[in-house]
Swiss-Prot record:
Keywords: Cytoplasm, DNA integration, DNA recombination, DNA-binding. The keyword Transcription does not apply. It comes from Streptococcus equi subsp. equi (strain 4047). This is Tyrosine recombinase XerD-like. GO terms for biological process: DNA transposition. One of its GO terms (molecular function) is DNA binding. Residues 92-248 form the Tyr recombinase domain. It is found in: Cytoplasm.
Length: 248
């Protein structure tokens, strides 16, 4: 089925960002169902989307349904299948923050800069402004640490094994900043644009730098970190702004 992805994309008039998103979703779908497309494998695929947001689910189901129709038209499938993409969102007066399935953030992508920005927020809780100021000299990949200096002092953060490969690739160039623009940092808007394009490509357009930072907080809390420890990791003067996450 994977062989049909590129002809399918060529048959549609898609912007580059949308094309990358379609390709990612369809490769993921084909890897999961293999060559056996039937009601059972499609049901299992739908179940695998249960940890995603409503918007991400609808996007993936819509993409796959279009692909299934294309396969039927091309006689690659003898039967026409269509998954139910009607998803009812659950609403409450007080939205509850939950930890997300972030496996898609680590998958292969054409949006490498946006991906690394997202991972630095998700894994280290950094803000776009802090990321803009990161220099290659701040990283010690051998010791797996980042030393971030600010007016409040130096924060030493551990780099996870999952994050290291992305940093190793990004720090190969001879430059001053991690994201370098003629030995100067890029603008704040540039970082938001890169992040937005990456999030859209993985079907998470509703997320933002702030919501990824909240995921960092929730993950650290789940790992057993105290509110004081998380405040220190984020470089906060006080843990007051974190109280709502620890009352959940």
């Amino acid at each position: 089925m994977i062989a049909f992805i590129e002809p399918f994309l060529a048959s549609k008039s898609l912007a580059n960002n949308s094309q990358q998103s379609y390709r990612y979703d369809l490769r993921q779908f084909c890897q999961q169902v293999g060559q056996r497309i039937n009601p059972e494998t499609l049901a299992l695929y739908q179940q695998s989307l249960s940890g995603l947001t409503v918007a991400a689910k609808k996007r993936k189901l819509s993409t796959v349904n279009q692909f299934l129709y294309y396969l039927y038209q091309q006689k690659a499938l003898t039967d026409y299948f269509k998954m139910d993409d009607r998803i009812e969102a659950s609403f409450s007066l007080k939205p509850q923050l939950t930890r997300l399935d972030t496996s898609a953030f680590y998958a292969e992508t054409a949006f490498l800069k946006g991906q690394l920005i997202a991972l630095l927020i998700l894994e280290l809780g950094l803000t776009p402004s802090e990321i803009a100021g990161l220099r290659l000299a701040d990283f010690d990949l051998g010791l797996q640490v980042l030393r971030l200096q600010s007016h409040r002092g130096i924060r030493v953060m551990t780099l996870s094994k999952a994050l290291l490969p992305f940093l190793e690739k990004a720090t190969e160039a001879q430059q001053l900043y991690l994201f370098d623009h003629d030995a100067k940092p890029f603008s704040r808007q540039w970082f938001f644009n890169q992040l937005r394009d990456f999030l859209e490509s993985i079907g998470c357009a509703e997320l933002s730098a702030q919501s990824l930072r909240e995921q960092f907080i929730l993950n650290e809390k789940a790992a057993g970190k105290s509110i004081i420890e998380v405040a220190q990791l984020l470089g906060l003067k006080s843990p007051i702004t974190l109280e709502k996450y620890y009352k959940m």
